Amino acid sequence: MRLRVLWVGKSREEWVKQALADYATRIRRYAPLELVEVRDEKGAMAEEMRRRECERLEKQIPPGATLLLLDERGEQMDSPGLAAYIGKQRDSGTADLVLVIGGAYGFSDAFRRRGRLLSLSPMTFTHQMVRVFLLEQLYRSFTILNNEPYHH
C-alpha cells in the first residue's frame, strides 16, 4: 500500500522540515510514502479559498484512493485504533491511502464528503504541528502493526 500525505501551504519552519524528513524516513521502512504540498490560496473569501485549495488537493489524489481527511469534526481514535485502520486498509488490498490536511479554512463540503474524517485531538493545533503529529502517528501505527517497541 502506498501512502500519500497532502497538505495546503509550505512547511516554513526548519524544525518542522527536519521532523517531517525524519518521520518520512522512518515510515518508508514500512511503506512507500510521498509528501505533497499544494499552494495555499490568498486574498479570497473563505469559501472560495476552500474551493480552490480543494481543487488543488483533488489533482493530487490517485484514482480509486482511500481518503482519510484530518478535520476538527472528525472521529477521534487512539494510536492502536489508527494502526488497526491502516492495517485493515493494507490487508484489504487498498493500493493508495491518502491522508489530507486542509488549509486554514478546512475543506469544502463536497471534498469533506469524499473521505473518512479523522480528528487528532479536540484541541486546535497549527497546521505545521499537525503535519509532524500525523507523521509521528503513522510511524507509531507501523511499529504497532509490526510489534516493535516504540509504542508502550
Curated annotation (Swiss-Prot):
Q: Which reaction does it catalyse?
A: pseudouridine(1915) in 23S rRNA + S-adenosyl-L-methionine = N(3)-methylpseudouridine(1915) in 23S rRNA + S-adenosyl-L-homocysteine + H(+)
What's the gene? rlmH
Q: Name one GO cellular component term.
A: cytoplasm
What is annotated about its quaternary structure and interactions?
Homodimer.
- Enzyme Commission number(s) from the entry: 2.1.1.177
Q: Which family does it belong to?
A: Belongs to the RNA methyltransferase RlmH family.
Output this protein's name.
Answer: Ribosomal RNA large subunit methyltransferase H
Highest classification ranks of the organism: Bacteria, Pseudomonadati, Thermodesulfobacteriota, Desulfuromonadia, Desulfuromonadales
Where does it mainly reside?
cytoplasm
Q: Which Pfam families match?
A: SPOUT_MTase
Q: What class of enzyme is it?
A: transferase
Give the location in the cell.
Cytoplasm
Which keywords label this protein? Cytoplasm, Methyltransferase, rRNA processing, S-adenosyl-L-methionine, Transferase
Q: Which amino acids does the record list as binding S-adenosyl-L-methionine?
A: L70, G102, L120, S121, P122, M123, T124, F125
Q: Report the function annotation for this chain.
A: Specifically methylates the pseudouridine at position 1915 (m3Psi1915) in 23S rRNA.
> Which InterPro entries does its entry note?
Alpha/beta_knot_MTases (IPR029028), RlmH-like (IPR003742), tRNA_m1G_MTases_N (IPR029026)
- GO molecular function annotations of the record: rRNA (pseudouridine-N3-)-methyltransferase activity
